[in-house]
Amino acid sequence: MGEKRQARQGADVLLQEEPLRFQTRKQVGLLGGNFNPVHLAHLVMADQVQNQLGLDKVYLMPTYLPPHVDEKKTISSEHRLAMLELAVADNPCLDIEPIELIRKGKSYTYDTMKALKEANPDTDYYFIIGGDMVEYLPKWHRIDDLLHLVQFVGIRRPNYPTESTYPIIWVDVPQMAISSTLIRQKVKSGCSTRYLLPENVINYIQEKGLYQDELDNKL
């Protein structure tokens, strides 16, 4: 009788442990940027990486203040976050990661990824960068430690080499000659931005009167 009870108890333990043993890790992409404002090239890049690599999601991660940017020259994080939320609303595979806006201060990728990995130990992160940024990786803050926290994904760019001493997954994404600078200039001059960014983001910019001041257009 005692042996049967022990057998049942052992089976119960196995049943409880089974889900943990067979858990699959989440595969998540991160696309960082100022998103001032977010535009279709950002969204196409995030969507293509998610689809081509089969990631669970790609999070657009707005910076509060990049290490190389003057705090006075960027639009408020409240507006940038609101536009991002509008931009990804119709795509369940895209989302927002606001960790750097919450933390505030200068944003070093290593610090951000360390915090994310500690908060989400079951997640593998894929950090998306443009091919033009790969050559600057040696200058990134604590790059050797960062390599233990993320897998870099490089977006191929014309006239930029794909050779690197760092492990990078390369992805082809349609090239779109759209930039936040271009959009801000068009808004400032009263030109149409249709087909450059989502319609709901265009409406938000108009409703809030964004990018009309010279200060708003410096980044």
From Swiss-Prot:
Keywords: ATP-binding, NAD, Nucleotide-binding, Nucleotidyltransferase, Pyridine nucleotide biosynthesis, Transferase. Pathway: Cofactor biosynthesis; NAD(+) biosynthesis; deamido-NAD(+) from nicotinate D-ribonucleotide: step 1/1. Its EC number is 2.7.7.18. Gene3D superfamilies: HUPs (3.40.50.620). The keyword Ligase does not apply. It catalyses: nicotinate beta-D-ribonucleotide + ATP + H(+) = deamido-NAD(+) + diphosphate. It is an enzyme of class 2 (transferase). One of its GO terms (molecular function) is nicotinate-nucleotide adenylyltransferase activity. GO terms for biological process: NAD biosynthetic process. NCBIfam families: nicotinate (nicotinamide) nucleotide adenylyltransferase, PRK00071.1-3, PRK00071.1-4. PANTHER family: NICOTINATE-NUCLEOTIDE ADENYLYLTRANSFERASE-RELATED, PHOSPHOPANTETHEINE ADENYLYLTRANSFERASE. Belongs to the NadD family. Catalyzes the reversible adenylation of nicotinate mononucleotide (NaMN) to nicotinic acid adenine dinucleotide (NaAD). This is Probable nicotinate-nucleotide adenylyltransferase.
